[in-house]
Design a protein with these regions (language model features):
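Extended boundary segments
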Residues: 1-17
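Short, hydrophobic/π-rich interface segment
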Residues: 102-138, 142, 155
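Short Gly/Ser/Thr- and Asp/Glu-enriched loop/turn motifs at secondary-structure junctions
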Residues: 143-148
Length: 156
């Protein structure tokens, strides 16, 4: 089975870059990057020093429900190319020692017992293991330090 690391959809990102409200109904904040620790969730690259970026609330779920976590993310303020879907861990994530992987069912709710902090070099193996289960529709990869949404992982 192949897996796919998936960045935020371009259609959603473009409306946010055009000034549409975020998941909390607020206009995204616009800042200038110092080049350190500003990962865009669309191109899956760091926003370079001097480039503008957006800070906004993102809810990576199709509808409101108790498990629909919302949290802060960064996006380039100007259009960027969406990261190609791939079965290879995007380079952006490789320097970080670990991430949270968590499985969700087709009802977009957490599948209990699936969430864990996983060493980065084991992400692909753990994703294969979790997505091999019939009760898991997709995974979220999140920061192990701040729980920030990084990307979605699906069967490929």
């Amino acid at each position: 089975m192949l897996i796919r690391f998936k960045a935020m959809p371009t259609e959603h990102v473009r409306v946010l870059q055009a000034g549409a409200p975020d998941a909390y109904g607020m206009t995204p904040e616009r800042k200038i990057s110092d080049g350190d620790g500003v990962p865009c969730r669309h191109c899956l690259k760091n926003v370079r020093a001097g480039e503008s970026y957006l800070i906004l609330a993102h809810r990576p779920f199709p509808r409101l429900q108790p498990y629909a976590e919302t949290g802060p993310i960064f996006l380039h303020a100007e259009p960027c190319q969406r990261a190609e879907e791939s079965d290879v861990l995007p380079e952006l994530f490789r320097p970080t020692p670990d991430y949270i992987l968590r499985g969700y069912g087709s009802d977009d709710r957490i599948v209990y017992g699936t969430g864990a902090v996983v060493p980065t070099h084991q992400i692909c193996g753990r994703a294969h293991e979790l997505l091999g289960r019939d009760d898991i529709a997709y995974l979220h990869m999140r920061s192990a330090r701040n729980n920030c949404y990084q990307c979605r992982i699906e069967r490929g």
